[in-house]
């Protein structure tokens, strides 16, 4: 059987195949073109986004530069300021970037009271004609003067860094800096509005040196008026006087830390207090030598004396030099011998003079606390419960961290809490001024939210901050006449300790630094007249004051920087006016409203 034979149309099949290949190639080409187009669009979009991001970031820095310059008023006390409202933007070549507009705003955010510092935010919005937006936020913080380890407006030509000085923390001067050939090491950044006029090769700048930097003006006395208002809210504004010498005052503030909860320490946040003493006799208040010292020595001192012991009654009674001879010893009880044998001197009104707390001792009086007395204080059974001014929000809800004195004030004691003490007159360091938790203690942590073990004190004087030349700080001859080294230390320690950041619109200095003993108290292995001056904090002043001399009078400096002030400056402490960079953030542009944003992030 024969099968049929089919005829094949080969030209037709070839045509179909060619058409199919053309379709495939066309599809591939179209896909390639589409992919290329998409890639171009993506690249274009990315480039555009990069431009918007750069424009927004530049806006942040431009606003910060303006509020740090002549336009500081752009930063408001509350709300926000519109700095740019849809302005065109230029690139680095000076050409306008087509289709791009920028909106920038600045205002306070976070805690806006200023108690813990001045904080703010800058918002920068870059937008193109298509409505695409990039929104950036920068946190800024106004720089506190407390951040400086050392600051001067004017450097004396006869004082320089040297003798192996080691300075931790930031240093700035608005004047030329000089270095002696004995050398100095600066462990923090150093800046000067002038230059290092001499001795630069004798210095080590571990974090760099900036010469011809911008000048930083000291705060004005008007800053004191602001602090007065905050102090009045918490019953912490007091009236002193300008009576007495430069290192004498009629008003004395004593810091006290009290264990309220019986846990064996005084570091809890509600355990800080002050007592306030007033007298018409400034010599008595600060334990100066009597007015007739040149004739009679310490014979008539009410501050200096020694203890009489009654072994039968197991009591000790302080008897001043003025009250000698004292029964039952009578004539055998010499005032001079009493001072030479375990003599002590105390500030006016001290419990140690009277053996107990005396509200009114006839020479002066302790000022009563005008607010309610906490049951926690009453429970301690202290005789001075009604005279303790709480320096914590727990026991004094209106306390803003500020104590204010109109006039001069003498200070001493143990500080528990965050406090700024401001005075229109001199602030006199009458005795040791220490934190409840030593600044070098491993228990101290100023970076966490817990205020325990975290003490900070700022001293702000409209004039000088003076270490008193009194019978406590300075070894003194019982008799003014005489020669040789018959000086006696009537203090409980052979040095002076100050835990505080110091800001004086004139000077920080030691009264009569160039007189008195030269080798009575040791500072380490070195004999000095008054021993070591231990200061932990910073010194900010118009011009440098002296604390001692090379022949041994006064103190030997032992300064160290308190890094805690970088995180937690004293309340309402004056600021330099300069805003420093903080963190930057991206903000979702969907539904963003600038007014609502500043309202949300501002708190009282």
Regions found by a protein language model. Give the residues of each.
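Beta-strand/loop motifs with alternating small/hydrophobic and polar/acidic residues, enriched
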Residues: 2-168, 172-175, 180, 185, ...
């Amino acid at each position: 059987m024969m099968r049929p034979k089919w005829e094949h149309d080969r030209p037709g099949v070839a045509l179909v195949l060619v058409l199919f290949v053309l379709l495939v190639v066309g599809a591939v080409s179209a896909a390639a073109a589409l992919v290329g187009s998409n890639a171009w669009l993506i690249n274009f979009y990315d480039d555009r986004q990069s431009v918007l991001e750069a424009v927004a970031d530049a806006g942040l820095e431009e606003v910060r530069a303006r509020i740090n310059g002549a336009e500081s008023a752009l930063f408001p006390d509350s709300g926000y300021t519109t700095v740019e409202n849809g302005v065109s933007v230029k690139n680095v070549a000076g050409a306008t970037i087509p289709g791009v507009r920028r909106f920038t705003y600045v205002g306070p955010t976070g805690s806006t009271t200023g108690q813990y510092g001045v904080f703010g935010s800058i918002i920068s919005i870059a937008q193109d004609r298509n409505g695409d937006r990039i929104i950036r936020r920068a946190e800024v913080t106004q720089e506190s003067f407390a951040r400086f380890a050392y600051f001067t407006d004017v450097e004396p030509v006869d004082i320089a860094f040297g003798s192996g000085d080691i300075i931790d923390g930031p240093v700035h001067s608005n004047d030329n800096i000089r270095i002696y050939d004995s050398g100095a090491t600066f462990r923090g950044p150093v800046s000067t509005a002038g230059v290092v006029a001499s001795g630069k090769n004798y210095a080590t700048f571990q974090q760099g040196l900036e010469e011809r930097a911008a000048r930083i003006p000291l705060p004005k006395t008007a800053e004191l008026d602001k602090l007065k208002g905050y102090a009045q809210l918490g019953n912490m504004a007091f009236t002193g006087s300008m009576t007495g010498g430069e290192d004498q005052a009629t008003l004395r503030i004593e810091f006290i830390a009290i264990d309220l909860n019986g846990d064996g320490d005084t570091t809890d946040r509600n355990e800080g207090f002050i007592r306030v003493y007033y007298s018409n006799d400034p010599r008595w208040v600060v334990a100066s030598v009597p007015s007739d010292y040149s004739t009679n020595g310490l014979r008539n001192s009410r501050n200096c004396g020694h203890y009489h012991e009654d072994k039968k009654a197991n009591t000790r009674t302080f008897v001043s030099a003025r009250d000698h001879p004292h029964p039952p010893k009578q004539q055998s009880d010499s005032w001079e011998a009493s001072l030479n044998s375990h003599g002590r001197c105390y500030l006016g009104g001290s419990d140690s003079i009277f053996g107990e707390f005396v509200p009114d001792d006839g020479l002066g009086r302790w000022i009563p606390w005008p607010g309610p007395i906490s049951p926690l204080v009453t429970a301690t059974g202290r005789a001075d419960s009604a005279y303790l001014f709480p320096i914590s929000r727990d026991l004094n809800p209106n306390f803003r961290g500020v104590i204010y004195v109109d006039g001069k004030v003498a200070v001493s004691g143990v500080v528990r809490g965050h406090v700024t003490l401001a005075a229109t007159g001199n602030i006199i360091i009458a005795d040791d001024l220490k934190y409840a938790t030593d600044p070098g203690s491993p228990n101290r942590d100023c970076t966490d939210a817990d205020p325990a073990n975290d003490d900070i004190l700022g001293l702000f004087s409209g004039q000088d901050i003076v270490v008193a030349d009194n019978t406590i700080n300075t070894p003194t001859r019982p008799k003014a006449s005489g020669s040789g080294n018959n000086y006696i230390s009537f203090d409980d320690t052979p040095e002076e300790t100050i835990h505080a950041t110091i800001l004086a619109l004139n000077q920080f200095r030691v009264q009569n630094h160039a007189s008195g003993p030269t080798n009575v108290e040791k500072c380490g292995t070195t004999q000095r007249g008054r021993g070591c001056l231990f200061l932990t904090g910073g010194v900010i002043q118009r011009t440098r004051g002296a604390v001692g001399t090379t022949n041994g009078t006064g103190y030997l400096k032992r300064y160290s920087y308190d890094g805690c002030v970088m995180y937690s400056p004293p309340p309402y402490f004056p600021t330099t006016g300069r805003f420093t960079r903080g963190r930057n953030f991206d903000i979702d542009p969907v539904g963003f409203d600038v007014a609502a944003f500043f309202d949300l992030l501002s708190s009282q």
